[in-house]
A protein has these predicted regions:
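C-terminal outer-membrane/trafficking sorting elements
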Residues: 2-81
Length: 81
């Protein structure tokens, strides 16, 4: 669980397009944190618990979706206020 923010550690082995999104349990997009090419290496992405319009999200379960090329990785996170 996290409050008020969480970090996502990402390591890439080569320069690649990366998309990191937060979605709710219904699969609706909450926020896009990264949507561009990143150099190879270690990257830290933070989510502050806000949606795309800057509104604070309620406590609950969310999913971090990390897409790199044709790969998609999803991880569950819990926001507690």
């Amino acid at each position: 669980p996290f409050n008020p923010s969480t970090k996502i550690d990402i390591q890439t082995v080569e320069r690649n397009y990366l998309k990191v999104q937060i979605v709710d349990v219904a699969g609706r997009l909450v926020n896009t944190l990264v949507d561009n090419e990143l150099d190879a290496g270690y990257h830290v992405v933070r989510w502050n618990g806000l949606d795309v319009s800057g509104q604070s999200m309620p406590s609950g379960m969310y999913f971090i979706q990390v897409q790199s090329g044709d790969r998609m990785n999803t991880q569950k996170i819990i926001l507690l206020k």
